[in-house]
Design a protein with these regions (language model features):
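Conserved short submotifs of the Hanks-type protein kinase catalytic core
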Residues: 69-83
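Protein kinase catalytic-loop region centered on the HRD/HxD motif
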Residues: 108-118
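ATP-binding glycine-rich loop module of kinase domains
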Residues: 17-42
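AlphaC helix of the eukaryotic protein kinase fold
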Residues: 38-52
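Protein kinase glycine-rich loop
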Residues: 9-15
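Activation segment signature within eukaryotic-like protein kinase domains
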Residues: 102-103
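AlphaC helix of the protein kinase catalytic domain
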Residues: 84-94
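Short beta-strand micro-motifs within the conserved protein kinase catalytic domain, predominantly
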Residues: 60-72
């Protein structure tokens, strides 16, 4: 299936609001979520604000397109790494400097979101990806 130039691949994750699919475009690998036309109309301002966020600690929104059936496709960067809730307790997080780097990254990401007028609403360790380089990236911005 192809939506707005994005080839839909395998399901990456299934959340409360539905699946996230892996997708590819000329810009590389990304994740795509679909929302109903009603949800899209309600969340369009949030997505527009999200495009203004420029922080390496917030997953980037690449595109928002309408599918042929009227649903909204939200395309965000794919962030390699593991959720913080999986990382907690691992040897990689034991050094104090590493923990500090993660907390500072979360704070910077939240500051960027709030600066754009976005309230996350569900900031949990499961919604923070720790990249292999130890950078914290806030995800799950799509919905309120």
């Amino acid at each position: 299936m192809n939506i707005g130039g994005y080839e839909i691949g395998q399901v990456f994750h299934v959340g409360a609001r539905g699946p996230l699919w892996r997708t590819r475009s000329s810009d590389g690998e990304a994740l795509l979520a679909l929302r109903s036309s009603d949800d899209g109309e309600r969340l369009l301002d949030r997505w527009k604000a999200w495009t203004s966020v420029s922080s390496r600690h917030v997953v980037a929104l690449r595109d928002v397109v309408r599918s042929d059936d009227g649903r909204w496709a939200i395309v965000q960067d794919f962030v390699p790494g593991r959720p913080l809730d999986v990382e907690i307790g691992s040897a990689d997080l034991r050094p104090k400097a590493t923990r500090r780097q993660i907390v500072e990254g979360i704070a910077a990401g939240m500051s960027a979101l709030h600066g754009a007028g976005i309230v996350h609403g569900d900031l949990t360790p499961a919604n923070i990806i720790v990249t292999p380089q130890g950078r914290a990236v806030i995800i799950d911005i799509i919905d309120e």
